[in-house]
Amino acid sequence: KELGLSENVHTFSVSMMDNSFDEAPYQRIMSSYARSIHHEIKVSAGDVVDSLFSTVAHLDEPTGDGAAVPSFILAREAKKYVKVLLSGEGGDEVFNAYETHRAYKARRLYRKYFPKAARSLISALAHALPVSHRKLSLDFVAKRFAEGCELEHDAAAHIYWRYTLTEEQKKSLLRFPAPAVDTDRLFIDAYDKMPYPDGLNRISQLDMRYYFIDDLMVKNDRSIMAHSIETRFPYMDDAVVKFAATIPPEVRLKGLFGGRYIEKQALKPFLPAKIFNRTNMGLEMPHSSWFFGGFKDLFMKYFTKEQVERSGILNYDAVKTLVWEHKAQRKDNGRALWCVLNFILWFDLFVYDGNYKDYLVRE
């Protein structure tokens, strides 16, 4: 914008057809401010269903990432205008913008100043809240935070706040004995071996090593390259990462709500106030509400006993429990059901039917 070149730049964003998941109003503010050529891609449940099989075929492995299909849809539109996209992935890890990073600091204060009896009362009140399918709803945040705070290890709490399935749910879903070592134990061991004295640096590294590298980069590369578009990650520039590593963790995350503090202060002169002052929000689908709406036909077809048990891996009774809890709004199992659905589709495309090539994008 400062060089007068922004009017030749194309920007792309996804608009979710659910207000609590939709960032479109802020995206319009930013694109208008930058004077870019903006493309807003509206994504409905029907759009996701139409692109789901192709996305699974290109990802090549089961995934529970709720942004994979929207990214695939965005890239299909971007293909009409550009060959390379710049992605903001990595900024949350480098500058501590995740809600779980703020929760890490809040947990320490919470356990320090609230005795066990008070925490038990707060947890009971949190679990009395009605289930909502809105993004980061009050009941979801309160329940997950209260439960994670009772775990003794920092890494165990961090992974608990990130989980899709609990250890008990994972074991019940399998038709054979689960691995001897729980997932959280693996992350605790990795956390304990990290050469950093500060816990915030350690959980940042956990996210970088296992979430960013094994999920976000894979999702971006495969879903976007499906349309022959390269994705670049400016936040992963060697100089940026090395600089961020020199910033004390208490400055990167200022107080409990100051994620990306240094980055935001540096960019303040170049950002509209409404963008500067808002909190972080990740791209995700409202699958929790869509499962009995726009996903209903897909759900009815692939959650039968025959489909669920076809792989010889999933236990139908456990899946049925997830469905019942979600439908009765006892729990928000939307992310868990999305993972199960993706596994079933992947198994059909790559193993049972073996017809994944029929869904690959042809230039």
Indicate residue ranges for each PLM-predicted region.
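Short secondary-structure boundary/capping segments
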Residues: 29, 55-56, 99-106, 357-358
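Active-site adenylate/phosphate-handling loop in enzymes that bind or generate adenylated species
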Residues: 72-133, 217-240
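A conserved beta-strand->alpha-helix junction
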Residues: 3, 8-10, 17-58, 178-186
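Flexible loop/turn segments at secondary-structure boundaries
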Residues: 18-22, 47-49, 93-95, 233, ...
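Adenosyl-5′-phosphate
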Residues: 36, 67, 80, 84-86, ...
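Short, polar/flexible loop-turn hinges at active-site or ligand-entry regions and domain interfaces
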Residues: 39, 60-64, 109-114, 250-254
